[in-house]
């Protein structure tokens, strides 16, 4: 019989919903029941999946979390969907900046859909089991969409650089054809970046408890469940995972450094404010996304590492897609007008 270590019982609890003694007891009984399932002889050869612990708490807490994340998911779909429709129907927004924004909003819908529906099913499930194929499909789409988001943020920064630093040549450089090619390349590069390492990890053998202390299939807990360590695969993934994040972040920083230098040369204060206002929304979105990612990769390990990983992942995969439409609509007058027209207000 395989027993849980102290780290396995280090459960991250949602504030105000699961912060009492009964939550811990319920979580312990849940883990104990799952351990029986996985380690019983009758199930060792037939079971093909993992257990996602998610946010362990009593049944009432699970229902409240289900309602909360359902509302967040629907608001995210509505906000990003509104931007897509506004750009599609308003002729004034048929410019590269807004075409990129509409594609980015579609990406955000895909990104949040890769995690939240499975979370909602997990809240209502007694077993909290996810199949091997379901786990690795979520693994692939979550990381591929995250990489695609990094590429899109870099392309949008490049667009702002051209608009401010090369205003006279902008219409001839950022053509509809170039914009389309950039969008396609973002999707293609994002989806091929992690393909080989994820396929290699999926071919490894897993044994032990098969309990993942997360709300999604994350590589860190997955690799700890392998029967035989694969240092080469772990090294490749640990290098490939942060590489697009930091490379594209440096590209964005460099682009905005040139933008700031160009804006500071504008003689009038009104001109400087207008130039900065065109970049403000994108800078806010970049700060939200990369701020949470840098906390994930840059902060030292903590005692409750699993809890930190859940919190940070929840922020940039669920909260950020919810806030992005609000940021773009508040900071952009043309987008506000288009959204008001779309909603008939």
Curated annotation (Swiss-Prot):
The chain crosses the membrane at residues 63-83, 93-113, 136-156, 182-202, 242-264, 276-296, 310-330. SUPFAM superfamilies: Family A G protein-coupled receptor-like. Glycans are attached at residue 43. It holds the Pfam family 7tm_4. It is a multi-pass membrane protein. It is found in: Cell membrane. Disulfide bonds join 135-217. Its main location: membrane. Residues 84-92, 157-181, 265-275, 331-345 are cytoplasmic. GO terms for cellular component: plasma membrane. GO terms for molecular function: G protein-coupled receptor activity; olfactory receptor activity. Keywords: Cell membrane, Disulfide bond, G-protein coupled receptor, Glycoprotein, Membrane, Olfaction, Receptor, Sensory transduction, Transducer, Transmembrane, Transmembrane helix. Residues 1-62, 114-135, 203-241, 297-309 are extracellular. InterPro entries: GPCR_Rhodpsn, GPCR_Rhodpsn_7TM, Olfact_rcpt, Olfactory_GPCR1. Odorant receptor. Belongs to the G-protein coupled receptor 1 family. This is Olfactory receptor 11G2. It comes from Homo sapiens. The lineage of its organism: Eukaryota, Metazoa, Chordata, Craniata, Vertebrata.
């Amino acid at each position: 019989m395989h027993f849980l270590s102290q780290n396995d019982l280090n459960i991250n609890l949602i504030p105000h919903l699961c912060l009492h003694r009964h939550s811990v007891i319920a979580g312990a009984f849940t883990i104990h029941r799952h351990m029986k399932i996985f380690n019983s002889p009758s199930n060792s050869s037939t079971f093909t999946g993992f257990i996602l612990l998610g946010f362990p708490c009593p049944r009432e807490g699970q229902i409240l979390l289900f309602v909360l994340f359902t509302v967040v998911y629907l608001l995210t779909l509505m906000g990003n969907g509104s931007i897509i429709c506004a750009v599609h129907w308003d002729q004034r927004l048929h410019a590269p900046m807004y075409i990129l924004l509409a594609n980015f909003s579609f990406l955000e819908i895909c990104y949040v859909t890769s995690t939240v529906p499975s979370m909602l099913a997990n809240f209502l499930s007694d077993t909290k089991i996810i199949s091997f194929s379901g786990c690795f499909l979520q693994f692939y789409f979550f990381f591929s969409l995250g990489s695609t988001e990094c590429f899109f943020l870099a392309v949008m920064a490049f667009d702002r650089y051209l608009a401010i630093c090369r205003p006279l040549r902008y219409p001839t450089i950022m053509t509809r054809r170039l914009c389309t090619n950039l969008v396609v390349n973002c999707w293609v590069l994002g989806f091929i970046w992690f393909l080989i390492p994820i396929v290699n990890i999926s071919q490894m053998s897993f044994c032990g408890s098969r309990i993942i202390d997360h709300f999604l299939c994350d590589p860190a807990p997955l690799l700890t469940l392998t029967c035989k360590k694969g240092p080469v695969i772990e090294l490749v993934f640990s290098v490939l995972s942060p590489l697009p994040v930091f490379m594209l972040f440096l590209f964005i920083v460099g682009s905005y450094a040139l933008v700031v230098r160009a804006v500071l040369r504008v003689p009038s204060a009104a001109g400087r404010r207008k130039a900065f206002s065109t970049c403000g929304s994108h800078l806010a979105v970049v700060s939200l996304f990369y701020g949470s990612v840098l906390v994930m990769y840059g902060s030292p390990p903590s005692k409750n590492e699993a809890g930190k990983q859940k919190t940070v992942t929840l922020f940039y995969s669920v909260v950020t897609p919810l806030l992005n439409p609000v940021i773009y609509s508040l900071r952009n007058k043309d987008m506000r007008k288009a959204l008001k027209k779309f909603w008939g207000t």
